[in-house]
UniProtKB/Swiss-Prot annotation:
It catalyses: uridine(38/39/40) in tRNA = pseudouridine(38/39/40) in tRNA. Substrate binds at Y111. Keywords: Isomerase, tRNA processing. It is an enzyme of class 5 (isomerase). Transmembrane segments: none annotated. This is tRNA pseudouridine synthase A. Formation of pseudouridine at positions 38, 39 and 40 in the anticodon stem and loop of transfer RNAs. It comes from Streptococcus agalactiae serotype Ia (strain ATCC 27591 / A909 / CDC SS700). HAMAP family: TruA (MF_00171). The active site is at D53.
Length: 258
């Protein structure tokens, strides 16, 4: 068997998430269906580095899969890309070692979250940015987001009832940009891993701080108390993008560890 690693992007609007689910359209199901056609009708299982939820998008999701023979990687990429549905793009395919695992090999993820703060909202962005109809002071959020950087127990920012025991993660970079011409806030988080709904909960909290309904110090309070009830609401998934995944063997990996 030959193992392949692929970078994929997708518009999550019409998917019930990445991972295969019964009676639901998923990214995994669509790619596996295409690979089966390319593999003479034999099943191929793919593994994903991140399990994005319903409505969540990706520019840089990474998958791996095995095929019974070596293939030209560009021909394989082209075949997959042209036969997958239009809302999935196969960006790159490469052959990797048999022990490579896209989820368990050490890596760094970057997520982006787009928030439309236009009044009125932009209906063309309804599937691609979460609308926030209340006024915000961006400088308050820029000050508060600094407290998320570092190694912390993010219990207060994960979904209640999660089964993950170790909730310590490291965020290497967190920032907010504002595209005035589009009324878009762009939140960017880079870290060694993120808990279930962590990014969406952090954004929901920062927006509440920006609106003045929580103090700038609330981030520190939540981290210290490890209490989800102290955080803001979970922002909707349509604004979330898995932007990039960098593995330990890639040159730029060390830049984030400094």
């Amino acid at each position: 068997m030959t193992r392949y690693k692929a970078q994929i992007s997708y518009d999550g609007s019409a998917f019930s998430g990445f991972q295969r689910q019964p009676n639901c359209r998923t990214v995994q199901e669509e790619i596996e269906r295409t690979l089966k056609r390319l593999n003479s009708g034999n099943d191929v299982i793919i593994h994903g580095a991140g399990r994005t939820d319903a409505g969540v998008h990706a520019y840089g999701q990474v998958i791996h899969f095995d095929l019974p023979q070596a293939r030209d990687v560009e021909k394989l990429r082209f075949g997959l890309d042209t036969q997958c549905p239009d809302d999935i793009d196969i960006v790159k395919v490469e052959q990797v070692s048999d022990d490579f695992h896209c989820r368990y090999d050490k890596h760094i993820k970057t997520y982006e979250f787009l928030v439309d703060i236009g009044r009125p909202k932009n209906p063309m962005m309804r599937n691609y940015a979460t609308h926030y109809p209340y006024p915000v002071i961006i400088e308050l959020m820029k000050e508060a987001i600094k407290d998320l950087v570092g190694t912390h127990d993010f219990t207060g920012f994960t979904a209640s009832g999660t089964s993950v025991e170790n909730k310590v993660r490291t965020i290497f970079d967190a920032k907010i940009q504002f595209e005035a011409s589009k009324n878009l806030l762009i939140f960017t988080f880079t870290g060694n891993g993120f808990l279930y709904k962590q990014v969406r909960n952090m954004v929901g909290t920062l927006l509440k701080i920006g609106n003045g309904r929580m103090p700038i110090s609330q981030i520190k309070t939540i981290l210290q108390a490890k209490n989800r009830d102290l955080a803001g609401p979970t922002a909707a998934g349509n604004g979330l993008y898995l932007k990039e995944i960098i593995y330990e063997d890639e040159e730029c990996f060390s830049n984030f560890r400094k």
